[in-house]
């Protein structure tokens, strides 16, 4: 009693259905927010709050790495983010590999770099090796991953905070995600937001295309990525919108 409570990283009340703000405000005195758009949700409940920014967007440390020391193939890079959980890697990686096979029929000059956690690297290697696709690499070192991303011409990413880092690097991208159908139905009942991507949620519109559930398949990913690669104006428009 009498001790003031400051909460860093606000509960995502903008994701879940109404009512959580009223319950949470009983236990906190002040909230430090990662995103500007969150402020309106807390101010309408008269909760003291302030925007402090997201560490992913504020980190400006640069690590100089010679790209040819890491990636031996002299090809344009497309970064691929299949997720960090077992369920994500097992569900999304086969879809992404089928997407790459489709891309290889049309484009010969791309290298697909899978960004992995150290814990998932072995699992990812096993899945990719079975595909016999020879224009892929797996990177798990965080410093190298950031450098690879900066050199990428495009990114295909699972939904999550990585989209902030991709946006910060001004890399055009799309978002994919697929979960168990029962889990999807449960989430759909609980969640009130229209979009899965944090940038789309903040903007209130579809800036980064999302392929979710049944739309998350190799043909749809191929079609969407190709449409960007063949239209520089589309790429410029997306990057411009993420900077607003």
Predicted feature residues:
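Nucleotide-activated sugar donor-binding and catalytic core shared by glycosyltransferases
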Residues: 1-244
């Amino acid at each position: 009693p009498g001790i003031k409570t400051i909460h860093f990283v606000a509960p995502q009340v903008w994701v879940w259905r109404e009512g959580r703000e009223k319950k949470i405000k009983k236990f906190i005195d002040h909230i430090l927010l990662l995103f500007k758009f969150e402020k309106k949700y807390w101010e309408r409940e008269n909760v003291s709050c302030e925007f402090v920014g997201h560490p992913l967007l504020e980190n400006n440390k640069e690590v100089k790495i010679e790209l040819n020391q890491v990636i031996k193939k002299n090809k344009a890079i497309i970064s691929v983010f299949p997720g960090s959980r077992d369920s994500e890697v097992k569900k999304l990686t086969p879809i992404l590999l089928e997407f790459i096979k489709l891309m290889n029929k049309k484009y010969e000059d791309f290298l697909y770099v899978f960004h992995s956690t150290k814990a998932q690297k072995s699992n990812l290697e096993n899945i990719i090796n079975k595909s016999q696709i020879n224009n892929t690499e797996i990177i798990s070192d965080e410093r190298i991953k950031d450098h690879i991303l900066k050199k990428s011409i495009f990114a295909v990413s699972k939904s999550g905070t990585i989209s902030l880092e991709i946006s910060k690097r001004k890399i055009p991208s799309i978002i994919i995600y697929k979960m168990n159908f029962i889990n999807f139905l449960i989430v759909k009942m609980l969640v009130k937001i229209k979009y899965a991507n944090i940038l789309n949620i903040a903007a209130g519109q579809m800036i980064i295309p999302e392929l979710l559930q049944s739309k998350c398949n190799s043909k749809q990913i191929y079609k969407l990525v190709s449409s960007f690669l063949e239209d520089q104006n589309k790429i410029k428009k997306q990057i411009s919108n993420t900077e607003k």
